[in-house]
C-alpha cells in the first residue's frame, strides 16, 4: 500500500463524522519502529497539514504497538482512543480477528473506523484501503516459477497467523504455482515472525532441513532491498543464496530482511 494515501483515509473518516471546531483523528499502525510505518506516519502528518490548510482543522494522534505481533497492545490503543471519543480512527489491524471487537465497540460508541493495509473480518468499518495482495503474491509466485524454469523445489516462508495482508499474498503465491506441475512445494507451514531474529531462525531451520531450494519469502524488506517495484506497488528482490538456491523477497511492509 502507498503510505501517501493517508489523505484519502482521513477524508473517508471525515465524511463519516459531524464537523466540529477541530477533528481528532487517531492513526494506529501495526507497528511503529520500521521504515514502512515511519513513511505512513509522514503521510498522515502531510494529510493533517493539508486538511488544516484547506479549512478543516485536524489534530493527528499517532500510536501503535512496538512489535507487530503485540495484539494486546494494539487492542488497548484502540480502546483508549475510543474512550477519548476521538472523531475517527484509521487502523491497520495486525490481526484480522483479534481487532474485530475493539472496532465494533468504537463504532458503537460513535467513532467511525477506516481500515488500511490489512483487512478485518468485519463489516463495521467505513472503508478498507490497500493494495491487491492476492495479485501481488500471484505475480511473485509466477515470477519465481519462471526464474526456476518451471522445475524444482519451493519453500514458502509465511509471515504470521492472523495477518490478512500477508495471508492474501501467500494465497496468491500458492495459486500461481498451480500452473507449474513440475514444481514441488516442500514447505508452506512455517512462519518468519515480526522480527529479523525470528525470520533468520526460521529460514535457517528450513535450510538445514531441506538444503538447496527456491524460496518465496513474502513478508520481509528494508530500505536497502528496493530493487524492483511492480504495478501493485510492492517491492521485490532476487538473490542467490549461499547454498545455491534462488531467493525471492516479496514484502508486505517495511520489516528488516533477515538476509
Model-predicted segments: where are they?
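Gram-negative bacterial Sec-dependent N-terminal signal peptides
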Residues: 2-19
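A residue-level marker of the well-folded mature domains of exported/periplasmic proteins
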Residues: 19-259
Amino acid at each position: 500500500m502507498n503510505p501517501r494515501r493517508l489523505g484519502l483515509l482521513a477524508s473517508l473518516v471525515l465524511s463519516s463524522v459531524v464537523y466540529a471546531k477541530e477533528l481528532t483523528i487517531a492513526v494506529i499502525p501495526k507497528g511503529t519502529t520500521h521504515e514502512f510505518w515511519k513513511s505512513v506516519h509522514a503521510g498522515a502528518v502531510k494529510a493533517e497539514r493539508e486538511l488544516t490548510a484547506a479549512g478543516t482543522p485536524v489534530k493527528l494522534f499517532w500510536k501503535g504497538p512496538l512489535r507487530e505481533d503485540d495484539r494486546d497492545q494494539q487492542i488497548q490503543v484502540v480502546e483508549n482512543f475510543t474512550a477519548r471519543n476521538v472523531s475517527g480512527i484509521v487502523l491497520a489491524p495486525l490481526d484480522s480477528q483479534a481487532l474485530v471487537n475493539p472496532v465494533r465497540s468504537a463504532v458503537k460508541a460513535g467513532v467511525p473506523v477506516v481500515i488500511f493495509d490489512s483487512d478485518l473480518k468485519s463489516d463495521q468499518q467505513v472503508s478498507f484501503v490497500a493494495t491487491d495482495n492476492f495479485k501481488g503474491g500471484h505475480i511473485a509466485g509466477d515470477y519465481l516459477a519462471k526464474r526456476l524454469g518451471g522445475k524444482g523445489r519451493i519453500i514458502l516462508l509465511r509471515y504470521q497467523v492472523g495477518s490478512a495482508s500477508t495471508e492474501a499474498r501467500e494465497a496468491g503465491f500458492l495459486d500461481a504455482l498451480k500452473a507449474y506441475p513440475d514444481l514441488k512445494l516442500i514447505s508452506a507451514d512455517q512462519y518468519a515472525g515480526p522480527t529479523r531474529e525470528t525470520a533468520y531462525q526460521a529460514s535457517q531451520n528450513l535450510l538445514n532441513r531441506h538444503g538447496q531450494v527456491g524460496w518465496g519469502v513474502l513478508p520481509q524488506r528494508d530500505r536497502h532491498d528496493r530493487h524492483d517495484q511492480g504495478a501493485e506497488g510492492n517491492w521485490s528482490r532476487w538473490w542467490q543464496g549461499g547454498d545455491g538456491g534462488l531467493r525471492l523477497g516479496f514484502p508486505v511492509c517495511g520489516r528488516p530482511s533477515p538476509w
